[in-house]
Amino acid sequence: PQLKDGTKLYGMQHKYDETCLFFPSQSQTCHAYCSFCFRWPQFVGMDEMKFAMREGEQLVQYLKEHPEISDVLFTGGDPMIMKASMFSVYTDALLDAKLPNLKTIRIGTKAVSYWPYKFLTDSDADETLKNFEKIVKSGTHLAIMAHFNHLVELSTDPIKEAIKRIRNTGAQIRTQSPLLAHINDDADMWAKMWQKQVSLGCIPYYMFVVRDTGAQQYFGVPLVKAEKIFRTAFRKVSGLARTVRGPSMSATPGKVHVLGVSEINGQKVMALQLLQGRESEWVGVPFFAKYDENAIWLDDLEPAFGKKFFFEDELKTKYTKTA
């Protein structure tokens, strides 16, 4: 994206109308180095405070120019790798601007599960939580998008205490994870994990389809199997855990939700819809692909009826870069 004066913003992504992703330059690493991660290593080594100030101002200006944006998602890497004093430079800039369109600040992080001490005993743990409180007291909703890949990650006392301390600030924790072959491709585990998350006061949010990273051939789960795992787990939990959605692919046209396998006019098909789309008119529109038990991504699927999916022409015209 860019500002109206032509300034290009390299640390941002505005794919969906209401949500802006922001990549602080100081968050381009993580407490964990998951081999299935889809965020490639990014730049470091700049004059941190100076760069943060400038980025914060540009983010505010972009939000002023785009009143349709209600949510800012801090991502990376992992924003919680930053010291609290550095992270607050960004959040204070947003709060001080008193933007009427900004309703929610989201933080995508693995720290809750992988390094809970960020919120317990690190030198800036208390300052981090005070910053969370400040955001909430401003009237802005704070959502911690916590990555939990397995039930066992919820079993330790530090994890439970970190969740408690975060929730005491008024922040809400929503949980998400990719479905990973050899790791968590088990419906019973997912059901128990969602139930445990609810018991700890968290909200199950997404089951993702693992992206096309270097390890996809190991971690990838066929879409048909992924949907069956999700559906089986979904049936085992109460309504409080049925806030979760999936399996979802963050593909080029948007977040593609695999609804299930059906039969139309004697033809076995896969039913899908967009939970988020490059164009808001695409969201919620059902579409169908030929049944393919080996497909692991949207690109592997073929339209069940016609030669193209309904969004393809507009996607190609508006969003495909030409040489």
Regions found by a protein language model. Give the residues of each.
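Short Fe-S-cluster ligation motifs
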Residues: 58-75, 240
